[in-house]
Amino acid sequence: MNPVLLDGKKLSEKIKEEIRSAIEERKTKNFRIPKLATILVGNNPASETYVSMKVKACHSVGMGSEMIRLREQTTTKELLDVIDKLNSDPNVDGILLQHPTPSGIDERAAFDRIALHKDVDGVTTLSFGKLSMGVETYLPCTPYGMVLLLKEYGIDVAGKNAVVVGRSPILGKPMAMLLTEMNATVTLCHSKTQNLPDIVRNADIIIGAVGKPEFIKADWISNGAILLDAGYNPGNIGDIEISKAKDRSSFYTPVPGGVGPMTIAVLLLQTLYSAKEHFTPPVK
């Protein structure tokens, strides 16, 4: 086998360059610069890092960025009031509420308060419902990033057996739906799935989205499989035992440098789409 590395870092830079050019063109036409508002509640160190990365990414493409920092003791009502103000602000195109929020916050209520046309992170129940019905909306960033990687490398998933390991509402479930829209035959697995190794062995495409280091073992994987690892665990380890499995694969994403960079690139891309007043194009 001569496995091909799916270079998310390279593709993300290509996407960001296209965004940068689009913003420059908007400037020449005296159009408003797209703007992303990010809300950080509390002092979670990992969240601080992720938010700073998103702010930096906005600046790198010439996009406006507003970071709203709220105290750990913020109530759900106070957070909803902040989201309402951003919803009504015509200069804000996208709203991102950094997950996780403190335990005292009703996070689902906060996510669902985000206006559909500003839900550039694809986290609202309404966005998820539209995705499930094949209706245009904004998509969860990590799954859509994986779809763009597949398309960039000319991988046609139609008719292939795809196994998604993990069923979170922002990763596993939407990825399964997107692959279904692309005419793959999808099996969605989780902690209660029986005979998981046998199911994975029959897969042409394997998506690691379970959040457990090297949970998907190399000896579960058939020769020529396509491996997309959305996991990122301490020690730069993904959910798939990539180091042992990649030589038998046809395509694979590295960790880091595969799926991760695509997540932020898609966030910026969907913010640009919002500024242009249209949803993300269909994945087919």
From Swiss-Prot:
Keyword tags: Amino-acid biosynthesis, Histidine biosynthesis, Hydrolase, Methionine biosynthesis, Multifunctional enzyme, NADP, One-carbon metabolism, Oxidoreductase, Purine biosynthesis
InterPro entries: Aminoacid_DH-like_N_sf, NAD(P)-bd_dom_sf, THF_DH/CycHdrlase, THF_DH/CycHdrlase_cat_dom, THF_DH/CycHdrlase_CS, THF_DH/CycHdrlase_NAD-bd_dom
Domain of life of the native organism: Bacteria
GO molecular function annotations of the record: methenyltetrahydrofolate cyclohydrolase activity; methylenetetrahydrofolate dehydrogenase (NADP+) activity
Documented EC number(s): 1.5.1.5, 3.5.4.9
Positions bound to NADP(+): 166-168, 191
GO cellular component: cytosol
Pathway(s) served: One-carbon metabolism; tetrahydrofolate interconversion
A family per Pfam: THF_DHG_CYH_C
Catalytic activity: (6R)-5,10-methylene-5,6,7,8-tetrahydrofolate + NADP(+) = (6R)-5,10-methenyltetrahydrofolate + NADPH; (6R)-5,10-methenyltetrahydrofolate + H2O = (6R)-10-formyltetrahydrofolate + H(+)
Keyword Amino-acid biosynthesis carried by entry: yes
Record GO biological process: L-histidine biosynthetic process; methionine biosynthetic process; purine nucleotide biosynthetic process; tetrahydrofolate interconversion
Function comment: Catalyzes the oxidation of 5,10-methylenetetrahydrofolate to 5,10-methenyltetrahydrofolate and then the hydrolysis of 5,10-methenyltetrahydrofolate to 10-formyltetrahydrofolate.
Subunit relationships: Homodimer.
Entry's family note: Belongs to the tetrahydrofolate dehydrogenase/cyclohydrolase family.
Protein name: Bifunctional protein FolD
Natural source organism: Leptospira interrogans serogroup Icterohaemorrhagiae serovar Lai (strain 56601)
Lineage: Bacteria, Pseudomonadati, Spirochaetota, Spirochaetia, Leptospirales
